A protein has these predicted regions:
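N-terminal beta-alpha lobe that positions the nucleotide/phosphoryl donor
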Residues: 1-160
Length: 160
């Protein structure tokens, strides 16, 4: 089955499940004022240690993050959550996670460059503006992945 076919098959069940969670939590997925954030975890019938990839904070976007900051009265929390969501999405969904310890993690590279620029050592030293900048840079890195993969496919076809 292709990806589009699978999405069409499960979409009604996903939408129904989200509606149930919204009713239980009293929040709405995608709502700017009272956002519902969900976590998505891969699963298998048989336990596979090390294979439980998770994406947290699904539901955050440029508008919802502002509402989350207002709702929690914690702008730092909201922007750091958004940063983490984009990073996990890149790692888990787009395969940007390094395959070995020698490989460079593109998100860590971006964060380390900003730490160097700001002359700080710890993630906790990032300002709210730094976190906003990281979100922008992470989104830029994530949007480049499909272009990179397309170029790789073209190169492989030419080489064949």
């Amino acid at each position: 089955l292709g990806q589009d076919t699978v999405v069409k098959m499960i979409l009604p069940e996903v939408e129904e499940s989200i509606e149930n969670i919204e009713q239980i939590m009293g929040a709405k997925f995608g709502d700017k004022e009272n956002p519902l954030l969900v976590s998505v975890r891969s699963g298998a019938r048989v336990s596979m240690p090390g294979m439980m990839d998770t994406v947290l904070n699904l539901g955050l976007n440029d508008e919802v993050v502002v509402g989350l900051a207002k709702k929690t009265n914690n702008e730092r929390f909201a922007w750091d959550s958004y940063r983490r969501f984009i990073q996990m999405y890149g790692d888990v969904v787009l395969g940007m996670k390094p395959e070995s310890k020698e490989d460079i993690d593109p998100f860590e590279e971006i964060m380390e460059a900003l730490k160097h620029k700001r002359n700080i050592e710890l993630d906790t030293e990032f300002t709210i503006q730094d976190l906003k900048d990281l979100v922008f840079d992470f989104k830029e890195a994530v949007t480049m992945v499909p272009c990179r993969k397309k170029r790789e496919r073209i190169r492989k076809k030419r080489a064949a």
